[in-house]
Amino acid sequence: MERTVIALAIISVVKGDQICIGYHANNSTKQIDTIMEKNVTVTHAQDILEKKHNGKLCSLKGVKPLILKDCSVAGWLLGNPMCDEFLNAPEWSYIVEKNNPINGLCYPGDFNDYEELKHLVSSTNLFEKIRIIPRNSWTNHDASSGVSSACPHLGRSSFFRNVVWLIKKNNVYPTIKRTYNNTNVEDLLILWGIHHPNDAAEQAKLYQNLNAYVSVGTSTLNQRSIPKIATRPKVNGQSGRMEFFWTILRPNDTISFESTGNFIAPEYAYKIVKKGDSAIMRSELEYGNCDTKCQTPLGAINSSMPFHNVHPLTIGECPKYVKSDKLVLATGMRNVPQKKKRGLFGAIAGFIEGGWQGMVDGWYGYHHINGQGSGYAADKKSTQKAIDGITNKVNSIIDKMNTQFEAVGREFNNLERRIENLNKKMEDGFIDVWTYNAELLVLMENERTLDLHDSNVKNLYDKVRLQLRDNAKELGNGCFEFYHKCDNECMESVRNGTYNYPKYSEESKLKRKEIDGIKLESMGTYQILSIYSTVASSLALAIMVAGLSFWMCSNGSLQCRICI
């Protein structure tokens, strides 16, 4: 009867009022990595790596790209007859050229410093084509017979639209001396060429003069070209070759042409009306009737994220390219929902075993149980402070990283392969550095965020512990058990930091003495029971040993001698 009373008293102590410090949990399956751990499930996270694109070529900030389709830049600028739709191209945001456009130099040959020309074009947004030397001004030369089956138009032989192939007239090719003064306020892009015949017979047939030359001069250019007559294999049905040149004529500068044959004269030039952040992108995509701030060869990216892994070449205001597959910033805390079998007061912060899915209005808070019931209450002050800090950190990272960043491909001619390889290695190295920096940044910030949450929960726990002092007992799982009755008003005072320790200290003191007395009485009772149990067990063992010995002596299994 006495033991029953003691047990009931102990149970009544365990059922005392309690308050627990805990943290939010939810059904999130988002995972992040830290310096120390991988695949940590958190309540909230923000992806900062864009992986998607729309698979289309789009306008860039409302300005359409110049998509050259099957034409190359050379075919467009010289006026390949198959590129007539681009003769008067409107303003463009960027230029799109296929990897292997079929309509380039229809008459076989070469474009001198072509890569530099493309670099110039890539920093231009608008050309205005103007006539500088009219075709009908060549009265002493044939300006209409210079056509080729290699450049057909509507089934007939034709030639590049923006230049004139001059042929002898009446078996005479008078020396050409022409000048043009740039009276415009803009720079002019001027194109011309020279024809290299297959043999001397073709040279005489077209130009009469066997020792021809083409000279071009400006304030910065002094060039003299001589036809290279040689036997060559046919390309596009032609054994001859054409070599094209270009220059930029500054305002108020003059260009002079002198030639005794083989001259491909400029008829039109390009006024560079608008310079800007353009580029030449290689892509096989079609225009998608869309608008974007960032374009890649694979499609447009519309994202505010600071990083992407779509394609290393971009045009516009783009995130930075990294090779990573995953960059996720933790904005919440570890998501460890409390296991039901542990009950409500199970045991982040090193001592709390699980989060509360019932607390939905804050990251950290309290759960209480008393005679008036139980409930959750978030600590909104510490939650808001943490949210503001993490939000500012994430925004700061995005703002610092998400600046305009372009990475357009550079082209090199066949003599510059070593430079091209070196350039590629350098660009790959930069990408590797960016990738490493981005991944390290995320890992470090995630570690700091989780540590911040642990620290905030621990601070909340210490705030309660310092208020309650010896008016409550620490249960070791984030909970405190009061030595006094604590109604809802009392619980609220603990939560808001106004707990009145002296008010409850006397009641707590009496309760502690009562519990200590029960423990002492219980200890005495259990000591008596322990002694009784030990003596009884020893006596029973002695009787068993004696009985076994007597039985063995009686049947001869054991010799018994009694000495007096």
From Swiss-Prot:
Which residues bear sugar attachments?
26-27, 39, 181, 252, 302, 496
What is the recorded membrane topology of this protein?
Single-pass type I membrane protein
Regions of this protein lying in the Cytoplasmic compartment: 549-564
One of the entry's Gene Ontology molecular-function terms is: host cell surface receptor binding
Biological process terms from the Gene Ontology for this record are:
clathrin-dependent endocytosis of virus by host cell; fusion of virus membrane with host endosome membrane; fusion of virus membrane with host plasma membrane; viral budding from plasma membrane; virion attachment to host cell
The stretches that face the Extracellular side, renumbered to this chain, are 17-527
Any stretches that span the bilayer, and where are they? Answer: 528-548
The record's section on Gene3D superfamilies has: 3.90.20.10, 3.90.209.20
Q: Which UniProt keywords apply?
A: Clathrin- and caveolin-independent endocytosis of virus by host, Clathrin-mediated endocytosis of virus by host, Disulfide bond, Fusion of virus membrane with host endosomal membrane, Fusion of virus membrane with host membrane, Glycoprotein, Hemagglutinin, Host cell membrane, Host membrane, Host-virus interaction, Lipoprotein, Membrane, Palmitate, Signal, Transmembrane, Transmembrane helix, Viral attachment to host cell, Viral envelope protein, Viral penetration into host cytoplasm, Virion, Virus endocytosis by host, Virus entry into host cell
Locate the site labelled Cleavage.
Answer: 342-343
Q: Where in the cell is it found?
A: Virion membrane; Host apical cell membrane
Cystines in this chain: 20-479, 58-290, 71-83, 106-151, 294-318, 486-490
Main localisation: virion
Q: What processing steps or modifications follow its translation?
A: Palmitoylated. In natural infection, inactive HA is matured into HA1 and HA2 outside the cell by one or more trypsin-like, arginine-specific endoprotease secreted by the bronchial epithelial cells. One identified protease that may be involved in this process is secreted in lungs by club cells.
Which GO terms of the cellular component aspect does the record hold?
Answer: host cell plasma membrane; membrane; viral envelope; virion membrane
Q: What else is known?
A: Major glycoprotein, comprises over 80% of the envelope proteins present in virus particle.
Q: How does it assemble?
A: Homotrimer of disulfide-linked HA1-HA2.
Q: Explain the purpose of this protein.
A: Binds to sialic acid-containing receptors on the cell surface, bringing about the attachment of the virus particle to the cell. This attachment induces virion internalization of about two third of the virus particles through clathrin-dependent endocytosis and about one third through a clathrin- and caveolin-independent pathway. Plays a major role in the determination of host range restriction and virulence. Class I viral fusion protein. Binds to sialic acid-containing receptors on the cell surface, bringing about the attachment of the virus particle to the cell. This attachment induces virion internalization either through clathrin-dependent endocytosis or through clathrin- and caveolin-independent pathway. Plays a major role in the determination of host range restriction and virulence. Class I viral fusion protein. Responsible for penetration of the virus into the cell cytoplasm by mediating the fusion of the membrane of the endocytosed virus particle with the endosomal membrane.
Family according to the record: Belongs to the influenza viruses hemagglutinin family.
* Protein name, as recorded: Hemagglutinin
Species of the source: Influenza A virus (strain A/Chicken/Pennsylvania/1/1983 H5N2)
Record gene name: HA
